[in-house]
């Protein structure tokens, strides 16, 4: 995996507005925020995409993410927020180190804007897909 700006932030070579840090996780304010309070939560483990992250680091992120969401809601006074995580360029990942965005949504125009055409899941396709995924998880 190529070095990223996040590796340099983790090592302290690039400064950040740190919100939280432990042995496995670092959280800091985004320098190009979509809204006031936009934060990033990253594992210290180097992994390009979420599927490559260890279960241990994923669990550490899972313990920290809700706490940071609560703190951001309280401090910004915003009740609505998005948690966003992208994997690979096609899915809009720009920094190739797993990271989660917490983006406060104070109004319709600020924060993350999301619109997509909802599809319809065919019952037969859904049953077949679910069975295949369950089998893969058991492997």
Model-identified regions with their sequence ranges:
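HIT superfamily nucleotide-processing domains
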Residues: 1-139
């Amino acid at each position: 995996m190529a070095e990223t700006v996040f590796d340099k932030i983790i090592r302290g070579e690039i400064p950040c507005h740190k919100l939280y840090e432990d042995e496995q996780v670092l959280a800091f304010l985004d320098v190009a925020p979509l809204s006031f309070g936009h934060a990033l939560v990253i594992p210290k483990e180097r992994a390009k995409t979420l599927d490559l992250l260890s279960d241990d680091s994923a669990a550490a992120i899972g313990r920290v993410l809700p706490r940071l969401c609560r703190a951001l809601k309280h401090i910004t006074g915003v009740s609505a927020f998005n948690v966003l995580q992208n994997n690979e360029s096609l899915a809009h990942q720009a920094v190739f180190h797993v990271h989660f965005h917490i983006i406060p949504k104070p109004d319709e125009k600020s924060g993350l804007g999301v619109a997509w055409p909802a599809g319809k899941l065919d019952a037969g396709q859904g049953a077949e897909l679910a069975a295949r995924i369950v089998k893969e998880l058991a492997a």
